[in-house]
Amino acid sequence: YLVSPAGYAALGAYMFLLILVGFPVNFLTLYVTLEHKKLRTPLNYILLNLAVADLFMVLGGFTTTMYTSMHGYFVLGRLGCNLEGFFVTLGGEIALWSLVVLAIERWIGVFKSIRNFRFTEDHAIMGLGFSWVMAATCAVPPLVGWLRYIPEGMQCSCGVDYYTRAEGFNNESFVIYMFIVHFLIPLIVIFFCYGRLLCAVKEAAAAQQESETTQRAEKEVSRMVVIMVIGYLVCWLPYASVAWWIFCNQGSEFGPIFMTLPAFFAKSPAIYNPLIYICMNKQFPHCMI
């Protein structure tokens, strides 16, 4: 065993918590949206996509990790490793690109009156398709020989192999591709869209300083922007930073805990994504009651 039995018990307990909270919250999101017609709007499609992505991670990854943590190593073999790595990566990437699409949609929403643009169901479906295609460009290559999925950290879950330079897998090029396309670009887009959104709301508030409604809207949008950006950074910054450090320092000493902790952060959105992106929509709580 790479760590003490208490470490594996803690890992299993954390996975159980993610399943216990993540499954009902995301399932409830899907159920409530499908049951209430007023929630089935094009702008809410991407929130449904986010819930589906979280369920992928819960059912395809967290349950597996909880089971393998009871044994102290990944007991499901090469096929099991590929499947677990694929579902967790796919779910995580769908969620990531859903946040990008959501940021773009909200940015467009601010300027649609200026540009005479109407956000339709076709645009929403295009956003969903884009998030799935981008997720597939990250999750599929390790199955076909560009990089690979291997047990990582405490060896109870599988992820992309960013810490070895195995011959024949072109790990270096894939890690660089992942860091640029699946971390930096989404980060830039999210910062740009929410930054522009915040500026637009502040300009509107400045033009109507005496309007209490406008000032309240400014505060709500500002809070939403801060929470969304922090949520993205908490999820992906630790994982991307550690992966890049390990990649750039091949041969350095690092323990299993060092590689496992960032994965904890990357999996936590299955709980807080619904709370941030759905509960902040005032229609959802009313429909749940």
Swiss-Prot record:
Q: Which residue stretches are annotated as topological domain Extracellular?
A: 1-7, 68-81, 145-173, 246-257
GO CC annotations, alphabetized: membrane; photoreceptor disc membrane; plasma membrane
Tell me if Transmembrane is a UniProt keyword of this record: yes
Residues that the record marks as modified (N6-(retinylidene)lysine) are: K267
**Could you say which residues are annotated as the site Plays an important role in the conformation switch to the active conformation?**
E84
MF term (GO), any: G protein-coupled photoreceptor activity
Q: Which SUPFAM superfamilies match?
A: Family A G protein-coupled receptor-like
Biological processes per GO annotation = absorption of visible light; G protein-coupled opsin signaling pathway; visual perception
Q: Which InterPro entries match?
A: GPCR_opsins, GPCR_Rhodpsn, GPCR_Rhodpsn_7TM, Opsin, Retinal_BS, Rhodopsin
- Domain of life of the source: Eukaryota
Q: What keywords does the record list, in alphabetical order?
A: Cell projection, Chromophore, Disulfide bond, G-protein coupled receptor, Glycoprotein, Lipoprotein, Membrane, Palmitate, Phosphoprotein, Photoreceptor protein, Receptor, Retinal protein, Sensory transduction, Transducer, Transmembrane, Transmembrane helix, Vision
Task: Give compartment(s).
Answer: Membrane; Cell projection, Cilium, Photoreceptor outer segment
Disulphide linkage map:
C81-C158
What is the protein's given name? Rhodopsin
Organism encoding this protein: Leocottus kesslerii
Q: What is the organism lineage in this UniProt record?
A: Eukaryota, Metazoa, Chordata, Craniata, Vertebrata
Coding gene? rho
